[in-house]
Amino acid sequence: MTSHPRSLALAAAAAFALAGCGQQAAKPAEAPAETPAAPAAAPAPVAVAPAVDQAALKGLLSPDETLEVLTLDATGAASASGEVKGYKTTVYAVPVAQGQTLSVAFEPSNTNLYMNVVDAADTSGAAAHRGEVDGPKASIAAAKAGVYLIKPFQPRATARRGESGTFKLAVAVK
């Protein structure tokens, strides 16, 4: 649409006259703007736990250790019970996604049983939780996705004598 020069001149003169007497020209009425619909909230990212490579994990175990992969229920919890007899024990594998926290409660039948929690990807052999020092409860925040091994054990002196004890584990990944 083109504007006629005379119409523009009249509009400018009217605005100038109103400005001179301290008034402003009325703005043309605008159609009420519709409020845009809020964008749908993005779904929270789902933490994806890594797959458990049992063959690779078995390579990290001693001949006296057997591997069991814990299956978490819908709430992210699992429990297990077992026995340590001498050096023989079951090692429990738990996959944990980046940003999740692995919580483990170890309940031994005697004071000579402990558990360590080890990041399977850590080749240094250092435990993320040392039961003898840190106690029977572990809480580990995963900086990256990985598999953690829960390793019940007894000290060498009692293991060499072939002593045994039972335990219960309560595991949660949140």
Model-predicted regions and their roles:
Residues 21-24:
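Bacterial signal peptide processing site
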Residues 26-56:
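Juxtamembrane proline-rich low-complexity "stalk" or linker regions positioned immediately after a signal peptide
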Residues 51-97, 101-105:
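N-terminal secretory signal peptides
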